[in-house]
């Protein structure tokens, strides 16, 4: 079983070393800079407009794919969302549906090298950590997403996940009925700017007030979520 406290260490620590890792090495003198790596991570610039009702995981993946394709990507995209076991189907862990990395944003900055670093699976991985900040967690157009201090604040990201990227197993609803409801339930949220809340986690900070668009806005979000290229 993964250690949640190690994942929490990675979630709460952002150092200059991570920023250095995200930079491309300078080209030799007299040579043009190499092109940035293709985008493989972004925050969705728009959700479903129906709160946490995304049409299930498949609907959320379609949103990621549509936005990425419009931005010129030819990769296959999945939403970073967990789902609870239901109707005879096993739980789905967000961490298991996003490929293996590395992941780069629309400006070529590396967000994480692999799944272990993204979540801080081990002490070593937690020390390396990820580069998830307001500066790097941008949308597919390369635009910054509003965070704490901006109006309106939109830093809440739908994840339905624990710190280690797995689905909750306590029997409570953390996914607004597996992303099909805009009425009953709650959704677990992360903060893309890693500001506010107890653990300043990018993927598991606090639950929403509800599942409607109005509830998500009132909590400090807009029904947005993370998208990762799986190839």
Regions found by a protein language model. Name each.
Residues 20-231:
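Secreted/extracellular ectodomain signature
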């Amino acid at each position: 079983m993964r250690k949640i406290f190690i994942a929490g260490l990675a979630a709460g620590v952002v150092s200059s070393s991570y920023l250095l890792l995200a930079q491309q090495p300078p080209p030799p003198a007299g040579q043009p800079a190499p092109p940035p790596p293709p985008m493989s991570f972004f925050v969705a610039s728009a959700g479903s407009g129906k709160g946490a009702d995304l049409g299930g995981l498949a609907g959320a993946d379609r949103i990621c794919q549509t936005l990425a394709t419009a931005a010129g990507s030819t990769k296959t995209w999945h939403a970073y969302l967990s789902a609870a076991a239901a109707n005879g189907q096993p739980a789905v862990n967000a961490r298991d549906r996003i490929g293996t990395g590395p992941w780069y944003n629309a400006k070529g900055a590396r967000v994480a090298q692999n799944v272990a670093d993204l979540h801080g699976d081990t002490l070593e991985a937690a020390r390396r950590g990820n580069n998830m900040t307001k500066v790097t967690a941008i949308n597919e157009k390369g635009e910054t997403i509003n965070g704490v201090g901006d109006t309106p604040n939109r830093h809440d990201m739908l994840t339905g996940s624990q710190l280690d990227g797995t689905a909750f197993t306590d029997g409570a609803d953390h996914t607004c009925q597996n992303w099909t409801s805009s009425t009953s339930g709650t959704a677990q949220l992360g903060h893309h700017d890693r500001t506010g809340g107890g653990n300043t986690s990018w993927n598991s900070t606090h639950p929403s007030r509800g599942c409607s668009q109005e509830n998500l806005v009132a909590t400090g979000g807009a029904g947005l979520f993370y998208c990762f290229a799986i190839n």
